[in-house]
Amino acid sequence: MESKSRRPTLLSRGQLRLLIWGLPVVILLLSLLGPESQPDAVISADSDRRIYQQVIPQQTLFRLHLIAPHPPALDASIQLRQRLITQAWIMRLQKPDELGDWLSAQGWEVQVQANTGYRLLQLKSDKPFADNDVRQLLQQLQTPPRVDWSALLQRTQAEQYMMRQNAEVSLTSPPSSNEHPSLDPLADYARQLQPSDWRITLTGPEPLSLSSVIFDPAPSPAPSENLMLSLKPLPVSPAADVQLQLHRWTLPQVHSAQDFAQLLLGRELVVQPLSHWLKQRLADAPAHQTGYSLRWEATQGGGLASLLLQGEQWPEIPALLLQQLQPENVETARQALLTQLEGDTGRQQWMDLLALYQLPPDSLQRLPAQLEALELSAMQQWLQSRLLSDYYHTLSLPH
């Protein structure tokens, strides 16, 4: 009888016993070590710095922000024109017979926001955004809505009037002017919302290949003499319950990560001495109505800073801000900014600023090093150039 050949075993009984006893120990060690750390997500941009993108694996939705820059309003008439176009833009997005039904069919969640220097359209989707859909959206957005423009202007005038009747809003709003320019709403709408003017930021669980073809323009409508409107804001006479004083200055253009770092650090260095002075003031006289608000408004050309003071006996603001600028203040401001950068919240809002200023996509990664390199003397010079410039001005509204 032939003997059957035995197949060689991969592991002996002793080795199997060792593996069985040792495997739980290995699993325990791996669990204690925790998951492998993931590198920070890198922001990328196309060659024209029009589309900024960041892959966030743990994010379940795709988020697309569309940014349309425009100059800040210099007077009430220009503000009225911008508000009119913004209201028409919102109607175009929301009315079912305009873009409302089309957006619903895409399954997109839509939010709009109007800022001093740009309009922002935020889209959320559980499916990737495609070139053709985004291109179609931008081209349709350039088409004005079918609306009674005279009635819309009257409604916008009334809304502007109600806002400017508020003392604080009136003081921080653009001033009134004796000039009342005319407007062709169809042509102006199409000009302000050209596809080629939009910038994009995009985050999602996987990269998308959006291309510059989405910015191809649509034909602009011909001007119509029958639709010429006169931009005449309604006069207001606001009354304040407490002394109000506005301090406003321009913010410089941002061309690099260093400019961006100075802009952000400068804001923190304005907030610190104001908060410190106000805290002492309220401790000494808690019954006094005293406070402040600071608006740091980003625009394509730099921005505007508006400081509104409430109450009396405030010190001279330029002197206060410059005298309180010490090395420890710079370090505190730097750490506050680094804490903001490390947080996950507001990640895409940082990218929106990169797109608005068209900065290199690695600017946020370089920001900690740029902040560390900014010394006291550089920030003194930067802040002094803002507070002592010809563009610095003050307005007051007595109670």
Where are these regions (language model features)?
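Short beta-strand/turn micro-motifs at beta-sheet edges
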Residues: 51-56, 107-112, 187-189, 233-237, ...
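Extracytoplasmic/periplasmic C-terminal soluble domains
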Residues: 158-253
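His/Glu-based metal-binding/catalytic segments typifying zinc-dependent metallopeptidases
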Residues: 44-88, 217-280
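M16 family metallopeptidases and their MPP-like homologs
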Residues: 60-82, 98-142, 155-180, 197-202, ...
